[in-house]
């Protein structure tokens, strides 16, 4: 008899509190955790927390990397950060700590832990985001219904959505006219990179449209460490991170954004070419 079957057979006769304290029943009891969202994707987690969460909201979900690995998705001010949670078979590992049971793991979150990453941003985990939320059973009635196009088929239905892929943190930026370096707060959402005077500023100094960016790469011309640049037709922006790891993270996510943008543009061009061929 397997471990899961054994646990299932004992579930009705044992006190649930005893099961929560067991080291071998961790993943089976995750289903009873109200803020465990199962196989929720990274994209869906970001959309959920950004649209309906608040600073300090978090949820636990399956990681798509390997069995026994989970992702803790946390809402910061303007982004969602993801952290690994590992189940070893007898304990949960998160951050610098290891918990011998799910009960101890959850108790840690009940005490509102403070965590920080390479960005230097500190977050207090205050608000577990529930898997189930009450919703009204209200539907709209269709009053107008017609087709705006003709001659299209199911092949024209290509689901597309911009990747959220959020990130935020302080970077040191070189000025445009006066080549001095100033520390600014940067946020990345969808295809926009914004920078602010500081983290508390309500309005950005500038918004950069990444659809106009042609390249992101490490830079060694400014005689500064952890420096990288964004190339636009009108200007090259030079940015420096505090650490090499942080610079690498910014470069990776920005390059990933550019690859997605180019892919969407290529798909759009292919669609236009195929339609022009049909109507020739």
UniProtKB/Swiss-Prot annotation:
The modification Phosphotyrosine is found at residue 139. GO terms for cellular component: cytoplasm; plasma membrane. It is a peripheral membrane protein. Induction: Upon B-cell activation. It is found in: Cytoplasm; Membrane. Residues 164-259 form the PH domain. Residues 35-129 form the SH2 domain. InterPro entries: DAPP1_SH2, PH-like_dom_sf, PH_domain, PI-Interact_SigTrans_Reg, SH2, SH2_dom_sf. Pfam families: PH, SH2. It comes from the Eukaryota. GO terms for molecular function: phosphatidylinositol-3,4,5-trisphosphate binding; phosphatidylinositol-3,4-bisphosphate binding. The modification Phosphoserine is found at residue 141. Its main location: cytoplasm. Keywords: Cytoplasm, Membrane, Phosphoprotein, SH2 domain. Phosphorylated on tyrosine residues. SMART domains: PH, SH2. Interacts with PtdIns(3,4,5)P3 and PLCG2. May act as a B-cell-associated adapter that regulates B-cell antigen receptor (BCR)-signaling downstream of PI3K. This is Dual adapter for phosphotyrosine and 3-phosphotyrosine and 3-phosphoinositide. It comes from Mus musculus.
């Amino acid at each position: 008899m397997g471990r899961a079957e054994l646990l299932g057979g004992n579930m009705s006769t044992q006190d649930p509190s005893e099961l929560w304290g067991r080291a071998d029943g961790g993943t089976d009891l995750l289903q009873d955790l109200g803020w465990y969202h199962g196989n929720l994707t990274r994209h869906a987690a970001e959309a959920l927390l950004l649209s309906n969460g608040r600073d300090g909201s978090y949820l636990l979900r399956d990681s798509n990397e390997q069995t026994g690995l989970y992702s803790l998705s946390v809402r910061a001010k303007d982004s969602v950060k993801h952290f690994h949670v590992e189940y070893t078979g007898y304990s949960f590992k998160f951050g610098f700590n290891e918990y011998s049971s799910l009960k101890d793991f959850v108790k840690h979150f009940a005490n509102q832990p403070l965590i920080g990453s390479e960005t230097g941003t500190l977050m207090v985990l205050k608000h577990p985001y529930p898997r189930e939320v009450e919703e009204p059973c209200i539907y709209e009635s269709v009053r107008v219904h017609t087709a705006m196009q003709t001659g299209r088929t199911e092949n024209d239905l290509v689901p597309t959505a911009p990747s959220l892929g959020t990130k935020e943190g302080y970077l040191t930026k070189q000025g445009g006219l006066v080549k001095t370096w100033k520390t600014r707060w940067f946020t990345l959402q969808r295809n926009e990179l914004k920078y602010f005077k500081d983290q508390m500023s309500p309005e950005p100094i500038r918004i950069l449209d990444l659809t106009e960016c042609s390249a992101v790469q490490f830079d060694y011309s400014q005689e500064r460490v952890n420096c990288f640049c964004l190339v636009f037709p009108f200007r090259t922006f030079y940015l420096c991170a505090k650490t090499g790891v942080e610079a690498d993270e910014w470069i990776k996510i920005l390059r990933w954004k550019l690859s997605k943008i180019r892919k969407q543009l290529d798909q759009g061009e292919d669609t236009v070419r195929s339609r022009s061929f049909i109507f020739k």
